[in-house]
Amino acid sequence: MDLAGYKALSFDCYGTLIDWEAGIAAVLVPWADEVGLDLDAERLLAAYAGNEAEVERDHPSAPYPEVLATAFRRTGETLGRPVGDAWARRLGDSVPDWPAFPDSAAALASLATHYALLIVSNVHRAGFAGSNRHLRCRFAAVITAEDVGAYKPAGNHFRALFDTLDELGIARGELLHVAQSLFHDHVPARKAGLASVWINRRHDRPGWGATPEPSEAWSYDLELRSLAELAAAADAAFAGPAGLPGPGRPA
């Protein structure tokens, strides 16, 4: 694909720019130790993933801290250990503390020299504001679950994204969506007819982590392992005529 053929990039934030699995595990692991569960971070994240997606589906207007707390409590029920209010609040309040991936800030700064950058995220505004202190990026637009009253993979974010593109004077065909989660992003991006890049942050680990396995069709146009790889590929594309091939695997 020719990365120089696009004018804007829309990003999922958590899992793509911010290491939400590390942030969630930083609460789940000490809780498991306290309640006597001999489970590592990967197994805890796998137990948690479906619960968060279920809460988001059933309560689309719930604030994200509330989603986190409720999903944590349900995970405790699944694992046979209660989650107290203090632990639930600890996870719910933790979003601003979740770390950025090491390459995110520099890659965004580089990509911003070529594209308008937009955020399409399953979070609340205050949570993203805290996260952007780690990313240090001026985005052309930020679309959150709080703004659209729903959580991906529902299509609300992408409908709002298209309205934003109209305001920015950018055609849909000039937008490339960039995300890690097949479930949350590449399924609805396919439905919306968007080209997309899969940032496969879990390329060196088995399983799905904090993200459910997708049950609907998904596709992507390019797979990369990091945001740094995308920034380097964009620099190369804008420096010369050669594009970068990389077909995805349609489901």
Whereabouts are the PLM-identified features?
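N-terminal helical cap/lid subdomain that shapes the substrate entry/recognition surface
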Residues: 2-102, 113
